Amino acid sequence: MRYIRLCIISLLATLPLAVHASPQPLEQIKLSESQLSGRVGMIEMDLASGRTLTAWRADERFPMMSTFKVVLCGAVLARVDAGDEQLERKIHYRQQDLVDYSPVSEKHLADGMTVGELCAAAITMSDNSAANLLLATVGGPAGLTAFLRQIGDNVTRLDRWETELNEALPGDARDTTTPASMAATLRKLLTSQRLSARSQRQLLQWMVDDRVAGPLIRSVLPAGWFIADKTGAGERGARGIVALLGPNNKAERIVVIYLRDTPASMAERNQQIAGIGAALIEHWQR
């Protein structure tokens, strides 16, 4: 009897650890969907091999929101590599060209901005006018979609400009991607010969320098880990992030997370994405 009591005591002593441990990634995603009363799409992909490690609704469509800006700047860099564009080229614009949330471009009406500066503003600060000015250089939404088709992405599509593309209507395929397609496209841009090595480094550096992603995966990143990311936010609860992660300050995996159709606040959406990121990282470290 004494032996049995000791066994029970030993078992109970382990329960707090089980209760407080982070759930497995898919368990966390299911929990997030329940708490958000919405949909979550996610994929975790090995950067080197392209192998899918974790996936949930990875082939369902979600609004891209501002995550499209990474692909946009990839298209711009492809034009630079082809000799059709220069990062140093100055673009001038007018007050009527500005749209909501243009924290960088609104300060340069007098002097304009270079193509490279516009890419930096679009990715690091999610500047919407910068994105529209860059979209014009690649042929608008149709031109960017054509670029995606050229590199083998037959799913992702951009149909509108900022800020209309963030409408996120249920059942609307416009301006959407799937987690799997976005991850595969990002991998092509950063590892294949679609871009020169120099352009790959530049695109990655812009993502490293992201200044508006603090409340998401960056908030749960262990010391010494690498992250390069781009976030997006839209109407009807849409939120998203595309990221490269890895220990020892090395990019090893692509993580794409999208939310949609949730009444949750921005803070709640950020917290859920951070929670999914934390579960992925903990599972990775085991």
UniProtKB/Swiss-Prot annotation:
Reported impact of Y101 to D/E/I/R/T: Reduces resistance to ampicillin about 16-fold in DH10B E.coli strain
Consequence of changing Y101 to A/C: Reduces resistance to ampicillin about 100-fold in DH10B E.coli strain
Activity regulation info: Inhibited by the beta-lactamase-blocking agents clavulanic acid, sulbactam, avibactam or tazobactam, or SA1-204 or LN1-255 via a covalent binding to Ser-66. Inhibitors SA1-204 and LN1-255 may be approximately 16-fold more effective than tazobactam. May also be inhibited by tazobactam via a covalent binding to Ser-126.
Domain of life: Bacteria
Disulfide bonds: C73-C119
Any Pfam family the entry gives: Beta-lactamase2
EC number, UniProt record: 3.5.2.6
Active site (record annotation): S66, E164
MF GO annotations: beta-lactamase activity
Effect of Y101E: Reduces catalytic efficiency toward ampicillin
Keyword Signal among record annotations: yes
Induction description: Increased expression in clinical isolate strain 15571, in concert with reduced expression of a 45-kDa outer membrane protein, confers increased resistance to ceftazidime.
Positions of a beta-lactam binding: K69, S126, E162
Signal peptide (residue range): 1-21
Family statement: Belongs to the class-A beta-lactamase family.
Subunit description: Interacts with S.clavuligerus beta-lactamase inhibitor protein BLIP.
Job of this protein: Broad-spectrum beta-lactamase which confers resistance to penicillins, as well as first- and third-generation cephalosporins. Has nitrocefin-hydrolyzing activity. Inactive against the cephalosporins, cefotaxime and cefoxitin, and the carbapenem, meropenem.
Record's protein name: Beta-lactamase SHV-1
Native source organism of the sequence: Klebsiella pneumoniae
